[in-house]
Curated annotation (Swiss-Prot):
It is found in: Cytoplasm. InterPro entries: DNA-dir_RNA_pol_30-40kDasu_CS, DNA-dir_RNA_pol_insert, DNA-dir_RNA_pol_RpoA/D/Rpb3, RBP11-like, RNAP_Rpo3/Rpb3/RPAC1, RNApol_insert_sf, Rpo3/RPB3_RNA_Pol_subunit. The gene is rpo3. It comes from the Archaea. Its EC number is 2.7.7.6. Its main location: cytoplasm. It comes from Thermococcus kodakarensis (strain ATCC BAA-918 / JCM 12380 / KOD1) (Pyrococcus kodakaraensis (strain KOD1)). Signal peptide: none annotated. DNA-dependent RNA polymerase (RNAP) catalyzes the transcription of DNA into RNA using the four ribonucleoside triphosphates as substrates. GO terms for biological process: DNA-templated transcription. Belongs to the archaeal Rpo3/eukaryotic RPB3 RNA polymerase subunit family. This is DNA-directed RNA polymerase subunit Rpo3.
Length: 259
């Protein structure tokens, strides 16, 4: 049975344990988050005027990498086919001054820069910049500009430290300062590594003797961070729905071949 346990939730990140799965599933979830969850990003730019020090191509690349809020409630982001809806982000600016992402005017109030303080280009006195940028839904497998964030995972492990190890109290204090769960018995302490934990060099000689690391079978600690396009919990939810839909499609194709 697959189980999820949330360890930490912040506005831009979430950490959770998923249990009852194997490495292929864990990696499939990671890859789906990075490459399959759709977001809005600038895909084409029409320049009407550019007197700045940067070429059109450089500014277009900068615009493409600006995270745009993606209204997940309005689109079926877990669908295998994407909506071809296009949003226009326009700009008309004159120097002197810095042009920021917040200066972009969107044709859709729900699709706009997630951070208004991203620099685009600095204009000198008399320099002008005018363009229309067109944002569309896309997936990270086609270009990194459509990746919704970053995700990584690790095995959930337990570090058993015998009380025969000199200075074992130091390890206990270090783990507690890191916010790691520590269980203590008469013979040992057990540190659950819900986040990365590195033993000080002085304890390395005790590995395999008084200190041993145990991998908890079928359990992984995931950390997911959002760029701002989508709420971080929606990224995980959409990725799981996409995985299920792809699995259903694969099973249906197998049944067709069997028939």
């Amino acid at each position: 049975m697959v189980e999820f346990k949330i360890l930490e939730k912040r506005p831009d990140s979430i950490k959770f344990i998923v249990s009852g799965v194997d490495v292929p599933f864990a990696n499939a979830l990671r890859r789906t988050i990075l490459s399959e969850v759709p977001t809005f990003a600038v895909d084409e730019v029409e320049f009407l005027e550019n007197d700045s020090a940067l070429f059109d191509e450089i500014i277009a690349h900068r615009l493409a990498m600006i995270p745009l809020t993606t209204p997940h409630e309005r689109f079926s982001l877990d669908a295998l086919e994407l909506d071809d809806y296009t949003v226009t982000l326009s700009l008309e600016a004159e120097g002197p001054g810095m042009v920021y992402s917040g200066d972009l005017k969107s044709s859709d109030g729900d699709v706009k820069p997630a951070n208004p303080n991203i620099p685009i280009v600095k204009l000198a006195e008399g320099q002008r910049l005018t363009f229309n940028a067109y944002a569309r839904l896309g997936r990270g497998k086609d270009h990194a500009k459509w990746q919704p964030g970053f995700v990584y995972y690790k095995y959930l492990t337990k570090i058993h430290v015998s009380k025969d190890v000199p200075d074992w109290e130091e390890l206990k204090e270090l783990a507690e300062r890191r916010g790691l769960p520590v269980e203590e018995s008469d013979e040992e302490i057990v540190i659950t590594t819900i986040k990365a934990f590195y033993l000080p060099r002085k304890f390395e000689e005790h590995m395999g003797k008084g200190i041993r690391e145990e991998i908890v079978p079928g359990s992984f600690v995931f950390t997911v961070e959002t760029n701002g396009e989508l709420p971080v919990e929606e990224i995980v939810s959409i990725a799981l729905k996409i995985l299920m839909r792809k699995s259903d499609r694969f099973i249906n194709e197998l049944h067709k071949l069997a028939d």
